[in-house]
Every structure is written in structure tokens, then in C-alpha cells.
Amino acid sequence: MRPNPSLILFLLAAFSTTAAFYSINSSEDYQRTTANDVLVFPRLNSKPEAANALLIETGGIKLKFTQNEESVWVAEDKFKYPASSKLIQKVISQLADMRKIAVKTRMPSRFNQIGVEPYQQADANSVFVKLQGAGGEILAESILGAQFRRNNIGVAEGTFIRHPKEQQAWLASGSIDIPSDLLSWLDTRILNIDSNEIKKIKIWEKPGGTAVVVRSNDDGGFIYQNRDGIGYLDREIAKNLFESLTKLSFVDVWPRKISGKWQSILYFEVEAYSGSKIAGQLFRSDSRTILQFSVKENGLKEVALRGLAGTIAYSELNKWSYAIPSWQADRFLEGLKIIEGGLQ
């Protein structure tokens, strides 16, 4: 009796599949051992508020953030300007909650496949992160690799991790938000004064003309005075000008003492109904617009700092030069139209 060729092929395929399955599962590189939900950083988890320094490194980029004496997070690489405490606290919380899910590869040749290759490489996709306490003790330290959302073992979110001094890679629960550019870590907010809270704006050039815009008491319009006389200001121009300090932010910042050869554009003084007065000057530097403030001590009241508590930047506006986005600079530049006249 001749053997059935189809049966032989089926048995060979079944044997090959079984052998391959056994080989993969017995290989140290492809262990599917679970980690029993063990915390990755138990010291951080037990006391996350002890974190005092955050170090990040990837592809040659190094960032360091520390807490100052006022417990404000600052960027050591950006003149100790205030960092986004919301972002840093989120990273601390995400790291503290991380748990080991499964053992992964130990083979260096496979590290780049899951993003846990040496972070010092120029083209590295991995990110090194370290959290330290006030005394320098390490609360968390790891290379963070690729992330995913939902997989075939029931994990909603996961991150591949590896300790920089160990070969073993792991799959851990959760995802981590680690921006690689410094600006994303800074608290880029400057001021937030609602336009309806502004009573009067004075703008002038040196040398040059002066103009004043006041909110009228009758119909909510705006009255201006310039070299042409007195008149009602176009509502769109007034709207843009009076929103110049609303949600004001920056794209770069440095200490006032560090300055360049900038061209002065205009001066301004804003008076709010609360009594707050904010003066400043606008400069042009190549393609950037630079903003500097001149605020008297205690000159800013709570109305100007709404939602901005907990950082040193807003009580020390005079110390910094801010490069602001062009669309925000355009709001201030509406003042030039009023100074130049020809609005009637």
C-alpha cells in the first residue's frame, strides 16, 4: 500500500511547526515569562514627591531639570527658566506607576527593534531617563524604548524598557511622554489678561509719535487719540491690540542681561481696570520679535496672573527677554497703525 502524499506533507508540516514553536519558546531571547506585575521603580512609587532632579538623554541631546528652593522645577540648560511642572509631574507619575509585564530579549542585536538600543548613539530612538532625590539617590533609571497601544496579550498601553547597565529588556505597562526638544519642557506662558479687563493702552515710538486707546463707557467701543486728533477706533484693530496680553507665550527666552543689536519697534503701557500697569518694549531681531517688560514691584495684581500661580517667571518679568510668535507680535503692531494716523 502506497503512503498518501498529502498525509506525509501534513505530518511534516505539523512536526516543523511544533519544532519551531518549541525552539522559540525555549530560547532565552524569546521568553514569554510574565513578570507578575512587579513595580519597575518601587522607590519612586513609594515616594514620588521625593523627586528633585530629572535627567534626560537621547541621541546626543542632554536635558536636566531640578527643583529650586521655592520647589519650582527649572531648566538647568536654559538659564534655570521655569519648566512645565505639569509635564514633569506627569512623567514622574507615569514612571512611578510602571509595572513589569513580560521578559523580552537579552540580545543586543535586537535592541533596536524595540527601541532600547544605547541612547548615546547619534541615531538612537531610545531615551534615557533618570530621577533623583535631593540627596542624589536614584529613584528611577531606565532606557525607554518603543511604545504601543493595545496588543494581543491584553495590555492597553506598554513600553519596552531596559536598565542601562543590564542586558535584559522588559515590557512594562503604561506609556511615557518624553519630548526631546527643550522648548516643549518649558512653561512658555507669560501673561494672560483678558481683553475686557484692559482699560487703556498707550503706545509710542522713540523718536516718533504717541497714541492712546481707551475703552469707552457707553457702547463698548474704543476711542483713540493720536496726531490726527480724537476718533473711534476700528473694532478689529482695537480687538487685536487689546488681546495682545491674552494668553501671551514665547518661543524662546533668555536673561535680559544677554542682549543683541536689536531694532526698537515700539513702547507700550497697558492699564487694567484692576489697577495693574504693565509697560514694555518690542524689538526686531532678524526674523524674530523680542518682547521685554518693565513692571514695578507689586504692579501686577491677580487679574494678570490668573491660572499662572506656582512659578517664578511671572513675578520676575523684568528679568527676561522673550521671543514671541509672529501672530502674537502682530497684535502689538496694530499700535503702529494708530501712531501713524490716517484712520479717519
Predicted regions and their residues:
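Secondary-structure "cap/kink" motif recognition
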Residues: M1-Q344
